[in-house]
């Protein structure tokens, strides 16, 4: 890709538009600035903003096939080489307010040695972190370094979320040891989050591994080494995800067993109560018929005697159940 003027990258809809100064900082893109590999430009767009969508459709600084991909719908992480540039799709943990972390956010990047164009549909915290480092003069110095920094920030957020899920599983395990059944749906949500992460982070790990192995002209050997380390770290996170999924299966079985045991105890208690009061129910039904000849019907203490007999009968049945070790 030949050098071009900064005015070709300027438009009102950009979220961020800066030129890397090659020293870890950034400067605004000027109309007369020449974009080259020593000072690549970074253009961050929100593809839902009409001005950005129009610019992507009209610009000549990227190939036609890239325009559609940068403004497209969410897909799984992947990497595609297109001539001198590379098109990369990655996923970020959703750290926006009032959003679940497992509702992952997509970031699409077209990157060359002179140009970085990234697009989003929802805010991505990793982008803001890289921008903060650049404003403080501690950011990436070139295109390859920028990509490694983004991959590292995304992986940091993923690792933190995996650790949070791990802690939640430990809390559930501790509750079960204390015979406490977790709230309805809590385990199902954790399991869903684990599965979603597993689905998208596996291809993302593969993307990082492929980038580290590709001989991309705009990446230094040190950047490739760091990218491989990031891929390895994400791979270890995926192993933790697999272990966590297995643990949730055990937890589900334990919860089912605990609920079944509680139900059995209640059923057993009701059965014992039925056994205790069955004889008394029979006698009260028998003596309650409106027929003549009921024993003690005319005696002044007949009702008291009958109640005392029922108490003795209940006590006898309870003693028998206790002796038989049913109680």
Swiss-Prot record:
One of its GO terms (molecular function) is cobalt ion binding. It catalyses: Zn(2+)(out) + H(+)(out) = Zn(2+)(in) + H(+)(in). It is a multi-pass membrane protein. It comes from the Bacteria. Residues 293-300 are periplasmic. Residues 1-271, 322-327 are cytoplasmic. Keywords: Cell inner membrane, Cell membrane, Ion transport, Membrane, Transmembrane, Transmembrane helix, Transport, Zinc. One of its GO terms (cellular component) is plasma membrane. The chain crosses the membrane at residues 272-292, 301-321. InterPro entries: CorA_cytoplasmic_dom, CorA_TM1_TM2, MgTranspt_CorA/ZnTranspt_ZntB, Zn_transp_ZntB. Pfam families: CorA. The keyword ATP-binding does not apply. It is found in: Cell inner membrane. Coiled coil: none annotated. Belongs to the CorA metal ion transporter (MIT) (TC 1.A.35) family. Zinc transporter. Acts as a Zn(2+):proton symporter, which likely mediates zinc ion uptake. NCBIfam families: PRK09546.1 (NF007092). This is Zinc transport protein ZntB. The lineage of its organism: Bacteria, Pseudomonadati, Pseudomonadota, Gammaproteobacteria, Enterobacterales. The gene is zntB.
């Amino acid at each position: 890709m030949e050098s071009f003027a900064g005015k070709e990258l300027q438009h009102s809809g950009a979220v961020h538009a800066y030129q890397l100064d090659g020293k870890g900082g950034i400067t605004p893109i000027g109309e007369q600035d020449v974009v080259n590999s020593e000072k690549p430009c970074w253009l961050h767009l929100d593809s839902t903003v009409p001005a950005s969508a129009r610019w992507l459709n009209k610009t000549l600084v990227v190939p036609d096939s890239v325009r559609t991909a940068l403004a497209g719908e969410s897909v799984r992480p992947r990497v595609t080489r297109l001539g001198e540039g590379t098109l990369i799709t990655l996923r970020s943990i959703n750290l926006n307010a009032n959003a679940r972390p497992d509702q992952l956010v997509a970031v699409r990047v077209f990157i060359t040695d002179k140009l970085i164009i990234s697009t989003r549909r929802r805010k991505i915290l990793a982008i803001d972190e890289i921008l903060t480092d650049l404003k403080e003069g501690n950011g990436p110095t070139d295109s390859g370094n920028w990509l490694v920094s983004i991959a590292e920030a995304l992986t940091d957020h993923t690792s933190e979320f995996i650790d949070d899920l791990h802690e939640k599983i430990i809390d559930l395990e501790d509750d079960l040891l204390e015979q406490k059944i977790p709230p309805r749906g809590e385990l199902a949500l954790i399991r869903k989050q684990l599965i979603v992460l597993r689905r998208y982070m596996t291809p993302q790990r593969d993307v990082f591994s492929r980038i580290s192995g590709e001989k991309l002209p705009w990446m230094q050997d040190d950047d490739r080494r760091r990218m491989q380390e990031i891929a390895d770290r994400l791979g270890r996170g995926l192993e933790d995800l697999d272990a966590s999924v297995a643990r949730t299966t055990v937890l589900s079985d334990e919860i089912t067993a605990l609920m079944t045991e509680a139900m059995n105890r209640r059923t057993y208690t009701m059965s014992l109560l039925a056994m205790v009061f069955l004889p008394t129910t029979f006698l009260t039904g028998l003596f309650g018929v409106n027929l003549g000849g009921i024993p003690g019907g005319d005696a002044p203490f007949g009702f008291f005697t009958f109640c005392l007999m029922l108490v003795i009968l209940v006590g006898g049945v309870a003693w028998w159940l206790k002796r038989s070790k049913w109680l």
